């Protein structure tokens, strides 16, 4: 949605909503109300939000934290920004505890028939698309944004013979990912605490690098650095795939201005992402072929390849 496409009244409404949200007490009130509504919706769908958070918050996470945390990961300011209504963004236990239940609640509007399992359906669709891209399954896979392991475990199911590495910049998420892996009996090879633009992994060490809902949370400069880093990690014939918001989707093009403003208040780099020409940026980063295709009413899948 461009600024020019907004009607004057919608533009004014958006401006007023934005100004109201900039007032901290009003933002806190709006955030608390939105949170209550989200939890209520989740629990009506059978998603045990409060029960899950209560159970996870009682655990001693120090041993797993010590396993995944890596000293020296210097997080730039954009990684410490507020996201999704959490003041500490992705760098807090609350975000980690609530990640899976919140994902199912948010994506239930896309797959209402799936109810409490809507996020699984969303990820499964993306990974089925990936399977179609590989006549021969990739042997070495990197999940560039593991969070608590949801996309990593789906990659493991889609490509059971592959060696899979999960990476994330948030040690809170990775601690939960390691826990979830143990609960599921997962054979994920390693959990890596690193920035996606500075992984520290070897050149050409993966046949497939995948990222799920990462780039709408990144400034443009960071996205460009990530693209270059991924290109470094891929050998000839390697593939980079990601799923993210589709700016051309009718869901965003027709979204009421005040709703879009509310959404952007929890996604500080969404405008930056919507302004990127992904195809041109990937070609500039050294990829040879780029395919972009819608895969849900709100998302697209991007496949970028390196020639053999």
Describe the residue ranges of each PLM region:
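A short glycine-rich, Lys/Arg-flanked "PGG" loop and its adjoining helix->strand segment in the class I
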Residues: 224-236
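Class I SAM-dependent methyltransferase SAM/SAH-binding core
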Residues: 140-198
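A short SAM/SAH-binding and catalytic strip from SAM-dependent methyltransferases
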Residues: 207-221
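Conserved alpha-helix/loop element of class I SAM-dependent methyltransferases that forms part
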Residues: 102-139
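C-terminal alpha-helical "lid/dimerization" subdomain adjacent to the S-adenosyl-L-methionine
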Residues: 224, 241-285, 289-294
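A short acidic, Gly/Pro-enriched loop at the edge of an enzyme's catalytic core
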Residues: 197-209
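N-terminal auxiliary segments of SAM/dcSAM-dependent transferases
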Residues: 11-98
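C-terminal lobe and adjacent flexible extensions of AdoMet/dcAdoMet transferase-like proteins
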Residues: 302-308
């Amino acid at each position: 949605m461009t600024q020019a496409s907004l009607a004057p009244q919608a533009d004014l409404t958006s401006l007023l909503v934005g100004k109201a949200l900039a007032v901290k007490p009003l933002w806190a009130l709006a955030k608390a109300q939105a949170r209550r509504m989200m939890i209520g919706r989740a629990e009506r769908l059978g998603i045990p939000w409060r029960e899950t958070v209560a159970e996870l918050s009682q655990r001693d996470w120090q041993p797993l934290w010590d396993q995944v945390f890596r000293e020296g990961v210097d997080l730039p300011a954009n990684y410490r920004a507020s996201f999704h209504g959490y003041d500490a963004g992705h760098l807090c236990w609350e975000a980690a505890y609530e990640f899976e239940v919140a994902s199912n609640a948010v994506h239930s509007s896309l797959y209402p028939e799936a109810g409490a399992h809507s996020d699984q359906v969303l990820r499964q669709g993306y990974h089925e698309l990936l399977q179609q891209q590989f006549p021969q399954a990739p042997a070495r896979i990197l999940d560039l944004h593991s969070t608590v392991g949801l996309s990593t475990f789906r990659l493991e199911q889609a490509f059971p013979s592959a060696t899979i590495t999960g990476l994330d910049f948030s040690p809170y998420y990775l601690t939960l990912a390691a826990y979830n892996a143990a609960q599921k009996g997962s054979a994920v090879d390693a959990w890596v605490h690193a920035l996606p633009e500075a992984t520290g992994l070897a050149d050409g060490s993966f046949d497939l690098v995948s990222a799920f809902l990462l780039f709408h949370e990144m400034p443009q400069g960071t996205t460009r650095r990530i693209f270059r880093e991924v290109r470094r990690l891929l050998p000839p014939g390697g593939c980079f795939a990601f799923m993210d918001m589709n700016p051309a989707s009718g869901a965003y093009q027709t979204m009421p201005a005040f709703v879009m403003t509310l959404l952007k208040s929890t996604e500080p780099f969404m405008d930056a992402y919507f302004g990127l020409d992904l195809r041109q940026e990937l070609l500039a980063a050294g990829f040879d072929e780029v395919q972009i295709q819608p895969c849900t009413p709100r998302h697209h899948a991007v496949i970028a390849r390196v020639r053999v």
